[in-house]
A protein has these predicted regions:
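Gram-negative outer-membrane beta-barrel transporters
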Residues: 26-28, 46-131
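Secondary-structure boundary/capping signal
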Residues: 17-19, 68, 116, 156
């Protein structure tokens, strides 16, 4: 079986009409199940021995006036093999494929409780390794989105009609490997 040991410490602070959060964490896993090979729609798995994920998360949720809101989050994550999982070479210390080291998100919008609302957001993911040997990787990417909608009450029901455009500038990116 796969087992985990996790340690996390965090803090939250109210700043005016906002909330700032921060956390440090570390998870050590024994016998983690990871992808061995994936081809033609078929995927096989293997046990990776020991792995470690350690990092930090920062978040901000800030309200301006009655209806303007800014949200932001950043994660730094170091996910590595602690034992060798490769056949011919040593992969100990290599990054685990498919996991970005840095991920960020920010949004800003007009969000009243009722009526029209609108906002935009931006998402970032740093490069991700595509194999255990760390010889191939998918590049980092950034995409922008827009949201708009209308909120109202109909009897006892709250209604929300909305539309969203993801990847506004039609960027090509690899979402997974």
């Amino acid at each position: 079986p796969s087992t985990n040991e996790t340690v996390e410490i965090g803090s939250k602070a109210r700043i005016g009409n906002g909330l700032l959060t921060a956390a440090l964490f570390q998870t050590d896993t024994d016998n983690e199940i990871v992808v061995d090979a994936s081809s033609g729609g078929r995927t096989s798995y293997k046990n990776a021995g020991k792995t470690r994920r350690q990092g930090m998360e920062l978040g901000l949720d800030q309200q301006f006036g009655e209806s303007w809101r800014l949200k932001a989050a950043w994660t730094w994550l170091d996910a590595t093999y602690r034992t060798n999982v490769c056949d011919d070479t040593s992969c100990k210390g290599n990054r685990i494929p498919g996991i970005a080291r840095n991920m960020g998100y920010a949004s800003f919008g007009y969000q009243p409780e009722k009526g029209w609302y609108a906002g935009s957001d931006i998402r970032y993911m740093s490069d991700i390794m595509a194999n255990d040997e760390n010889t191939a990787k998918a590049p980092s990417w950034t995409v922008v989105g827009l949201t708009t909608g209308y909120k109202w009450s109909y009897g006892k029901m709250d209604m929300d009609l909305f539309g969203r455009v993801d990847n506004l500038f039609d960027r090509s990116y690899a979402g997974s490997v």
